[in-house]
């Protein structure tokens, strides 16, 4: 349960926090704040995949083709990119955003990296609120129309909720009410990340 994993030859294991929340829950903004205030490195699974595609590598081309065909990129591919990013970064504490997307991702990540997250930060936000935000911001993303948005919610609920339940059973979920204004949400985040809160949890 709170056991420290044996280090895999590289000394201390990095601290990993999974950040989950539906589309429009505001987790990206909060991640930026956490990075700024607490010195974490923010790793977005989606950004890593996009960067790999851009690099024009063989791996990138394969990822691009899978996405084009509407297939899900295999867990191993995403995990390898995350692992590489963790190893190449001098930091030892990471926010992993938008991953694990499902139970299979979660199990594969723990098996491959032998890292269990310290906790899972879950930005809980009602669908109507997320919908309103996504339609309001329309950052030129063509996937921000109402049908697609609802599809994204459905996928999030069906695939990510089992992950949240799994970690809830281990007492590792820190749920944030993400329907509030940005500053109020960050106050809740701060209560979790401040050293006092960590001492209480320890």
Swiss-Prot record:
The catalysed reaction is: CMP + ATP = CDP + ADP; dCMP + ATP = dCDP + ADP; UMP + ATP = UDP + ADP
A single Gene Ontology MF term assigned here is: (d)CMP kinase activity
Cofactor(s) it depends on: Mg(2+)
List UniProt keywords, sorted A-Z: ATP-binding, Cytoplasm, Kinase, Nucleotide-binding, Nucleus, Pyrimidine biosynthesis, Transferase
User: Quick one: where's region NMP?
Assistant: 44-73
**Quick one: where is this thing mainly located?**
cytoplasm
Read off the SUPFAM superfamilies from this record: P-loop containing nucleoside triphosphate hydrolases
What enzyme class is recorded for this protein? transferase
- Record-listed ATP binding positions: 24-29, 137, 180
Which residues of the sequence carry a binding annotation for a ribonucleoside 5'-phosphate? 50, 71-73, 98-101, 141, 152
What is this enzyme's EC?
2.7.4.14
Q: What are the disulphide bonds in this sequence?
A: none
Q: How is the cofactor bound?
A: Binds 1 Mg(2+) ion per monomer.
pH curve summary: Optimum pH is 6.5.
Specify where the region named LID lies, as residue ranges. 136-144
Q: What cellular component terms from Gene Ontology apply here?
A: nucleus; plastid
Q: Tell me where in or outside the cell this protein is found.
A: Cytoplasm; Nucleus
* GO-annotated biological processes: 'de novo' pyrimidine nucleobase biosynthetic process; pyrimidine nucleotide biosynthetic process; pyrimidine ribonucleoside monophosphate metabolic process
Residues involved in CMP binding: 105
Task of the protein? Catalyzes the phosphorylation of pyrimidine nucleoside monophosphates at the expense of ATP. Plays an important role in de novo pyrimidine nucleotide biosynthesis. Has preference for UMP and CMP as phosphate acceptors. Does not act on dCMP and dUMP.
Q: How does it assemble?
A: Monomer.
Q: Which family does it belong to?
A: Belongs to the adenylate kinase family. UMP-CMP kinase subfamily.
> Which HAMAP family does the record match to this protein?
Adenylate_kinase_Adk, Adenylate_kinase_UMP_CMP_kin
Identify this protein by name: UMP-CMP kinase 3
Source species? Arabidopsis thaliana (Mouse-ear cress)
**What gene, per UniProt, encodes this protein?**
UMK3
